[in-house]
Amino acid sequence: MDDWGKWRLNLAVIDINQFKNLQLQGGFIITDIELTDAPIVDAIGREAIAQTSAIAREFRLIIRSGLNEEELSITLYHEILEAASVAIANPPAGVMDFNEADFERAAHNAHDRWGNASPANLNLLVQFHGFRGQ
């Protein structure tokens, strides 16, 4: 187990309300998060599990309801890492060239390493990938 693996914080149930107005390392803020039964589509019209809008360093997430705990956790890791990577002009070198598959792989790795997404684990995620500050 590496140093990052020692910080595994696993919550039994993910309460999305704990992420509202959450300040993350790197100066990012999750201003809102909601679950929806409405269809979500990505920028090119494909069905999506989630959609994140980033205005500067503020994120608003909409996630399809009905996901199981693991799917919700991986989705949170994926959306936050991707949003952080595109929200700033010069993201860390380790994520600069990430594509959708890379974000998904990183999200699965984060879930395997730290367990269910939580405020502390999302901060570990952004720190691990090189986002620093606030």
Regions found by a protein language model. Name each.
Residues 2-71, 87-134:
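Metalloprotease/metallohydrolase-associated module, dominated by Zn2+-dependent proteases
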Residues 74-86:
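Active-site recognition of the HExxH zinc-binding catalytic motif
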